[in-house]
Amino acid sequence: MSWAPVSTWSRRTPLAACCSAPELPPAGAWKACAAGSLRIGPQGRCKMMKNWGMIGGIAAALAAGIYVLWGPISDRKKYRKGLVPGLLNLGNTCFMNSLLQGLASCPSFIRWLADFTSKYRQENNTTEHQHLSVTLLHLLKALCNQEGTEDEVLDASPLLEVLRAHRWQISSFEEQDAHELFHVLTSSLEDERDRRPHVTHLFDLDSLEFPLEPQRQIHCRTQVPIYPIPSQWKSQHPFHGRLTSNMVCKHCQHQSPMRYDTFDSLSLSIPVATWGHPITLDQCLQHFISTESVKDVVCENCTKIHAAQIPNSQSVENRKTTFVKQLKLGKLPQCLCIHLQRLSWSNQGSPLKRNEHVQFSEFLAMDRFKYRISGCSTSKQPANHLSAAEQETTDGKEGGAQNPTMPFLNGACSTSYISPPFTSPLPTNPEWTSSSYLFRLMAVVVHHGDMHSGHFVTYRRSPAAKNQKLTSQQWLWISDDTVRRTNFQEVLSSSAYLLFYERIQSNLHHPEDQRAAEK
């Protein structure tokens, strides 16, 4: 034969050459080749056919690999349009993945993180990779297609490493609770905020010229005044709110001083369902702020009244009466996280999960649960400003009473009263349009399983396009690294565990006005 065997050629030729035809012999050698092949016999011809089959198989495999790596990119981009990346499950980290997808659906929280990191990450001594706010911001922006990545699945293990640096022992191989992780994140962000410098920057001329509390100046050893930083309330995260606690004596109607407590999420118990009637989110909120009687509370006013009725020589004991206590929402956050308590206990002390469906809606009016000061006007206010009840600390009355004739009350309605989510970016229901504290649903976290094991998934809105300011009406179902489109009716029929709402301005109906309200 006039050329090397195919097997020898294939060993000496580069791998890329396998995709092209082998070098052909001179024209005069064809006859000798044919004669030689006839002399080889059946076994030789079979061997040559196997060699040619091997070359064809290698070429086909390389062609398929090239197509997979470079060919379908445009198709994948077309398919991913409107979708978001999924998150890799690192063992049992579905609780973290579902929470991150829910947080990524809240634009106000991402904007706050961006502003927070730009102001304070240069003021701390820790390196940038140790900042929870920086790590969380990059991850949430990537989940909203704002980081320019083409990865369909992201790895959230850097977040676990940062939390461990904050001394949180979170294992990726043990099932955790998404609501508990939410409070771990918010408390760690507050710790990061509190570690910033406690004096005003020299280039902060406004704070130096007009200090908020000049009477509380701090003096160093040289007696040079160091002005305090502005109030930390200005840098609170968007989930931060305040509760008011009001107690009134049932005997003398004396009202104790108002107390304020902070919250990052509203943890609502699920009331017992009435036969034939569904449980609604409105009922859970009403149950949260319902009055309760507190017995054996010392009433200073009753003690004074009793002391005035007895001679001075006799000692006066503190009068204990029954007080009525009620909670109200003193400050509503920009982003509202609602936790539905699905843990209950059997008579034997075993944990049980409540699987009742709680009806919720796309829009949530919170005016009836808001604390208002006596004489405070109920006129509409912009969503990005605090009301007088949020700024004052004096006593006051309860919020507006519930109108029993309203057909819709935060989930207590039939589907005929639900505003179609695909036709209008803003609500058209009268209760919603007249609300001063209106919220829009952004994400729902659902837990499948029992109290001992299960899986978390998330329903969330698809991020709005870069050239579009209105909120997207496309909903997604996300389970770790699996992302698919879904419809809003599937979202409403889910058994919610965490609900993420974001405050909007209800009395505006034009896109230009909504863009101004969202700034």
From Swiss-Prot:
Name of the coding gene: usp30
Species of the source: Xenopus tropicalis
Family indicated by similarity: Belongs to the peptidase C19 family.
Name of the protein described by the UniProt record: Ubiquitin carboxyl-terminal hydrolase 30
BP-aspect Gene Ontology terms: autophagy of mitochondrion; mitochondrial fusion; protein deubiquitination; protein K11-linked deubiquitination; protein K6-linked deubiquitination; proteolysis
PROSITE patterns, per database record: USP_1 (PS00972), USP_2 (PS00973), USP_3 (PS50235)
Keywords: Hydrolase, Membrane, Mitochondrion, Mitochondrion outer membrane, Protease, Thiol protease, Transmembrane, Transmembrane helix, Ubl conjugation pathway
Subcellular localization, as worded in the UniProt entry: Mitochondrion outer membrane
Topological region Mitochondrial intermembrane: 1-52
GO cellular component, one term: mitochondrial outer membrane
EC number: 3.4.19.12
